[in-house]
């Protein structure tokens, strides 16, 4: 399985870091601190819970890249999405 959490964990990249993944996959990841949330940011690691949270992930990533969440919130509001 090439799920991001499993790959990152197997390579020691989740050690002491917060993350989220889909389903119960977190039970198979030894390193890291699982957080039950749609999107989790831990410094330069941004993880998403799954396809159902694609908007949350995309908006979070956009805000990070822009360095400002105000324009991202404006766009979310424009499509009637609460973020």
Locate predicted features.
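Active-site-adjacent pocket-lining segments in enzyme domains
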Residues: 3-83
């Amino acid at each position: 399985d090439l799920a991001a959490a499993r790959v990152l964990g197997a390579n020691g990249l989740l050690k002491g870091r917060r993350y989220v993944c889909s389903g119960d996959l977190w039970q198979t990841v030894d390193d890291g601190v699982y957080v039950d949330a749609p999107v989790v940011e831990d410094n330069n690691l941004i993880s998403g819970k799954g396809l159902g949270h694609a908007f949350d992930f995309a908006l979070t990533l956009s805000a990070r890249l822009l360095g400002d969440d105000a324009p991202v919130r404006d766009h979310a509001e424009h499509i009637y999405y609460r973020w």
